[in-house]
UniProtKB/Swiss-Prot annotation:
GO terms for biological process: glycolytic process; lysine biosynthetic process via diaminopimelate. HAMAP family: G3P_dehdrog_arch (MF_00559). Pathway: Carbohydrate degradation; glycolysis; pyruvate from D-glyceraldehyde 3-phosphate: step 1/5. This is Glyceraldehyde-3-phosphate dehydrogenase. InterPro entries: DapB_N, GlycerAld/Erythrose_P_DH, GlycerAld_3-P_DH_AS, GlycerAld_3-P_DH_cat, GlycerAld_3-P_DH_NAD(P)-bd, Glyceraldehyde-3-P_DH_2_arc, NAD(P)-bd_dom_sf. NAD(+) binds at T11, I12, G109, R167, Q299. It comes from the Archaea. It comes from Thermoplasma volcanium (strain ATCC 51530 / DSM 4299 / JCM 9571 / NBRC 15438 / GSS1). NCBIfam families: GAPDH-II_archae, PRK04207.1. One of its GO terms (molecular function) is NADP binding. The lineage of its organism: Archaea, Methanobacteriati, Thermoplasmatota, Thermoplasmata, Thermoplasmatales. GO terms for cellular component: cytoplasm. The keyword NAD applies. Its EC number is 1.2.1.59.
Length: 338
């Protein structure tokens, strides 16, 4: 059993902790929290709580939450840390991981050079085998890589144009916006294009990102110029081989991200998460060598399976197909069309 520590127990960290706990080849040995809030109180019923350093202990003690020790203490026990701290903190934490000889996974908010390789389970699993420091790419980049990889394998990819309509913030964050505005990223391509190249090779891609006042999901409008001609049925068949992609249909009442997230609730998933990338089947248009489609990305959870697979790759516990199968089975990910 690989002993996993979680540094940062926010949107991603708490979901990774639950996912790791669902595996039969790894275990959570502790989580790091900075505040004795309601999240810490609930988490303490299930996980050992650690703090960044001793200066945080009194606040937890005053709140009646037991603290096992500091991050340094957790690193004495953990073989690997999943660093889900806020953007930029992973780079600052890395020297401690190196000092304690612990492997580490970083999330997409960190720069690529924080790790030996960036990671997506479908597109470059093998690059992470045996590595000590791996970065799981962002929710948006994961969403693009998930659906572009099958197209690349089936038809080849010449060029990708993607418009990313991004949610403003996560549902539990009341401090960010916009609230009543549309906020474009004026840098073109947005950072997602070079990020995609870290897991899909030197793919020719351009991305535009626009932030809108919603918290549910991101939506991507994607156009792909392919090397081989494609048909609608051929594209759908290519995606059918991958469980982490689902097809949804307007005719079944799924017109918006609201219905997609309601569908996730009906799955009975932990936190109503949708690990899969949802593609509106009616949006798929393949004419000669151009494929167009629209997809929705649940930004809180689509990277969670990748974190589990990255752990297996780094410890060479399983090959790509076996790891993905184990992760999907444990999280209830199965091929679905709605």
């Amino acid at each position: 059993m690989i002993r996993v520590g979680i540094n940062g127990y926010g949107t991603i960290g708490r979901r990774v902790a639950n996912a790791v706990s669902s595996q039969d080849d790894m275990i959570v040995v502790g989580i790091v929290k900075t505040k004795p809030d309601y999240i810490s109180e609930v988490a303490s019923r299930r996980f050992k709580i650690f703090v960044p350093d001793s200066s945080y202990m009194k606040a937890f003690q005053d709140a009646g939450i037991k603290v096992e020790g500091t991050l340094d203490n957790l690193l004495d026990d953990a073989e690997i840390i999943v660093d889900a701290t806020p953007e930029g903190m992973g780079e600052k934490n890395k020297p401690l991981y190196i000092k304690k000889k612990a492997k580490a996974i970083f999330e997409g908010g960190e720069e690529p050079d924080v790790a030996e390789t960036s990671f997506n389970a479908y597109s470059n699993y093998n690059d992470a085998i045996g590595k000590s420091y791996v970065r799981v790419v962002s929710c948006n980049t994961t969403g693009l890589a998930r659906t572009l990889y099958p197209i690349q394998q089936a038809f080849g990819v010449k060029h990708v144009e993607a418009t990313l309509i991004r949610r403003a913030t996560d549902q539990n964050d009341s401090s960010k916006g916009p609230i009543n505005a549309v906020e474009p990223s004026l840098k073109i391509p947005s950072h997602h294009a070079p990020d995609l190249k870290t897991v899909m090779g030197n793919i020719d891609v351009n991305t535009v990102a626009i932030k809108v006042p919603t918290t549910l999901m991101h939506v991507h409008v994607v156009q792909v110029d392919t090397e081989k001609n494609a048909s609608n049925d051929g594209v759908l068949e290519a995606w059918n081989n991958y469980r982490r992609i689902i097809h949804v249909k307007k005719d079944d009442g799924i017109k918006s991200t609201a219905q997609i997230m309601d569908l996730a609730r009906e799955f009975g998933r932990d936190r109503s998460d949708l690990y899969e990338i949802a593609i509106w089947e009616g949006s798929v248009s393949a004419k000669a060598n151009r494929i167009s489609y629209i997809q929705a990305v649940h930004q809180e959870s689509d990277v969670i399976p990748e974190n589990v697979d990255a752990i297996r790759a780094m410890f060479n516990l399983a090959d790509k197909e076996k790891s993905i199968e184990k992760t999907d089975k444990s999280l209830g990910i199965e091929k679905r069309v709605y």
